[in-house]
From Swiss-Prot:
Sequence segments annotated as region (Disordered): 39-129
Domain Kinesin motor: 198-528
Cytoplasm among keywords: yes
UniProt GO molecular function: ATP binding; microtubule binding; microtubule motor activity
Coiled-coil regions listed in the entry: 638-673
Protein name (database record): Kinesin-like protein KIF2A
Stretches with biased composition (Polar residues): 99-115
Gene assigned in the entry: kif2a
Protein family per UniProt: Belongs to the TRAFAC class myosin-kinesin ATPase superfamily. Kinesin family. MCAK/KIF2 subfamily.
Post-translational modification: Phosphorylation by plk1 promotes location at spindle microtubules and spindle poles, and enhances its microtubule depolymerization activity.
Annotated residues for binding of ATP: 288-295
InterPro entries the UniProt entry points to: KIF2A-like_N, Kinesin-like_fam, Kinesin_motor_CS, Kinesin_motor_dom, Kinesin_motor_dom_sf, P-loop_NTPase
Length: 682
């Protein structure tokens, strides 16, 4: 039934009952009249004085017909639109039929059907003007939808131009591009202030290299602001749908792939130079995966296997040291500059400036660590430093890996030492660490690879704990846990000690796991959370000295300080060091100690004692036998005593060799007991 008549909109409102529910609808009068011709009022055409001229000639008619045909496609689209409206419940799907019939008559060429006022066109205008509000809203939504689809199509075409659609990771590449487009970039610039840190941890990202570009690897690292690093880790759901897991880390500084060595040095190592002039100890580490840019950062640019040492942090630090020596307040101190360069490989120390001579690391009665036999070269200028760096780099232990054709396999330590009248005034240690992914090679079938990986793993764990102890002023620093931290003991002990770590990362998706491990390691050193409210782990609240004394009193490890520190180190890193891995580290440490003792006794017995034996026979016993009336009883007694002494020495050496062989077998057995699901590499 009709409930109301709306004169303004020329429509009526009707209601009816359907299945017990009252329903309503608004219908315009034109639709009603088009369906019920008997109800339509008679239209009178008033021929006024403004009547248009008579019909034009045939050529004119043809032109009008042509113009009408160009509008036809628009009319053909109208029913489709009205059908969609009818599906929603509108009753405006049919008023177009009279117009279409009128248009068809005009297309047939009947001139008499074309009235002066063109009523068909007038009806079409009224129909479009009298659409209901519901239809208008639907048409607006349709226009927005079509406009949005057009924009999406243009965006897809633009992306197709920017990216290579043949890349197998094209989908991930588009996700990363979309995510980066939503970020606000504020990268680090040279105008930013330099903050003072006792412990500075920063990250440097290198660009994609030629190998990664050739295999179409993706850049999954983003550095939006000066202290934040984001990793876009590709993952896959159970239904094989790929997605990104974006992980955020915060450090003191973050350098993108465009930052040169000079910029990195300005914010990291340069603030430490003044420390050594103030009787302090400064340390700068380069840490990361093989091929991530550690040696490039510390030593300089590479051109194949040739390195430009003048652009590395080694040379830049030496340049500033000599510049500060010219300042009046330091010039009067009459300081002398010395340099040393050595490497630590598989727990052994080698002098890179003295034909890789093997050195011994000892601790004197004052608990001062001494590297016996290490050469210190006096340097007068930066050119002298560059020559020493070239000599050391040329003989550093390296090898070919899947990541790098010239990969460093040892920790290289370059030290700039200031001395005043022979006494140490300050020391700056610059360390290029070995690749952290080698720490996972602790279960290799090759013993040398196992020892190499075990030493790297242990030294990196010890380094992390020593830096944490320095930053938190802990009463005990486990520097004896590894040879690296033992040599650098002075850098972790004392109030005037400062440390900087440069974590270098590879941007490629293939290196994503190692990159995350590097960032997690660097994050644990200082623990700067993006939310700036992270609390220290629970185990840090306990006093390490108490635990160390407890183990010592229990007698589990005897009195060896290095074993106590190793135990402490593994206890503080339970999530990274399994019990089997700890047993393996213990076996390796014992084996290395036995090896040093055997080699030392071997050198003492055969070259030295044999010469004394021959000299003693020549001067004493053999000369005695040349006499006519020599005392044969005395000769036999002395010879027997010398032989017994010699036998005792050789027996002791033989026992040590047996113990060394047992240690080798124990290391072999321990390496096989490591859980295959071992902790990730540092």
């Amino acid at each position: 039934m009709v409930t109301s008549l709306n004169e303004d909109s020329e429509s009526i409102t009707v209601e009816w009952i359907e299945n017990g529910d009252t329903k309503g609808k608004e219908i315009d009068l034109e639709s009603i009249f088009s369906l019920n011709h008997d109800l339509a009022p008679d239209e009178e055409i008033d021929p006024g004085p403004e009547m248009p001229p008579p019909p034009a000639p045939t050529t004119k008619v043809n032109k009008i017909v042509k113009n009408r045909r160009t509008v036809a496609p628009v009319k053909n689209e109208t029913p489709a639109k009205d059908n969609r409206v009818a599906a929603v419940g509108s009753a405006r799907a049919r008023p177009i039929q009279p117009i279409e019939q009128s248009a068809s008559r005009q297309q047939n060429g009947s001139v008499s059907d074309i009235s002066p006022d063109q009523p068909g066109k007038k009806d079409f205008g009224l129909a479009s003007r009298r659409k209901s509000n519901c239809v208008k809203e639907v048409e607006k939504l349709q226009e927005k939808r079509e406009r949005r689809r057009l924009q999406q199509q243009e965006l897809r075409e633009k992306k197709a131009q920017d990216f290579d659609a043949t890349n197998p990771n094209y989908e991930i590449m588009c996700m990363i591009k979309d995510f980066r487009g939503s970020l606000d970039y504020r990268p680090l610039t040279t105008s930013d202030p330099i903050d003072e840190h006792r412990i500075c941890v920063c990250v440097r990202k290198r660009p994609l290299n030629k190998k990664e570009t050739t295999i179409k690897d993706l850049d999954v690292i983003t550095i939006p602001i000066k202290d934040v690093v984001m990793v876009h880790e590709p993952k896959q759901k159970v239904d094989l749908t790929r997605f990104l897991e974006n992980q955020t880390f915060r450090f003191d500084y973050a350098f993108d792939e465009t930052a040169p060595n000079e910029t990195v040095y300005r914010f990291t190592a340069r603030p430490l130079v003044e420390t050594i002039f103030e009787r302090g100890m400064a340390t700068c580490f380069a840490y990361g995966q093989t091929g991530s840019g550690k040696t490039h950062t510390m030593g300089g640019d590479f051109s194949g296997k040739n390195q430009d040492c003048s652009k590395g942090i080694y040379a830049l630090a030496a340049r500033d040291v000599f510049q500060m020596l010219k300042k009046p307040n330091y010039k009067k101190l009459e300081l002398q500059v010395y340099a040393t360069f050595f490497e630590i490989y598989s727990g052994k120390v080698f002098d890179l400036l003295n034909r890789k001579t093997k050195l011994r690391v000892l601790e004197d009665g004052k608990q001062q660590v001494q590297v016996v036999g290490l050469q210190e070269r006096e340097v007068k200028c930066v050119e002298d430093v560059l020559k020493l760096i070239e000599i050391g780099n040329s003989c550093r232990t390296s090898g070919q890996t899947s990541a790098n054709a010239h990969s460093s396999r040892s920790h290289a330590v370059f030290q700039i030492i200031l001395r005043k009248k022979g006494k140490m005034h300050g020391k700056f240690s610059l360390i290029d660490l070995a690749g952290n992914e080698r720490g996972a090679d602790t279960s290799s079938a090759d013993r040398q690879t196992r020892l190499e990986g075990a030493e790297i793993n242990k030294s990196l764990l010890a380094l992390k704990e020593c830096i944490r102890a320095l930053g938190r002023n802990k009463p005990h620093t486990p520097f004896r846990a590894s040879k690296l931290t033992q040599v650098l003991r002075d850098s972790f002990i004392g109030e005037n000690s400062r440390t900087c770590m440069i974590a270098t990362i590879s941007p490629g998706m293939a290196s994503c796991e190692n990159t995350l491990n590097t960032l997690r390691y660097a994050n644990r050193v200082k623990e700067l959370d993006p939310s700036r409210c992270r609390r220290p782990p629970p185990h840090d609240t306990s006093c390490p000295q108490t635990s160390w004394m407890t183990w010592k009193q229990c007698g589990e490890w005897g009195v060896a300080p290095q074993r106590d520190d190793l135990k402490l180190l593994c206890e503080q890193n339970e999530e990274e060091v399994s019990p089997q891995l700890f047993t393996f580290h213990e076996a390796v440490s014992q084996m290395v100690e036995m090896e040093e003792q055997v080699v030392e006794d071997h050198r003492a017995v055969f070259p030295g004692t044999s010469i004394r034996w021959l000299e003693g026979l020549k001067k004493c016993l053999l000369e005695m036998t040349e006499e006519v009336d020599y005392d044969a009883d005395s000769y036999a007694t002395q010879l027997e005593a010398i032989l017994e002494k010699k036998i005792d020495i050789l027996t002791e050496l033989r026992d040590k060799v047996k113990s060394f062989r047992a240690a080798l077998q124990e290391e072999e057995h321990a390496s096989k007991q490591i859980n295959p699901k071992r902790p990730r590499a540092l």
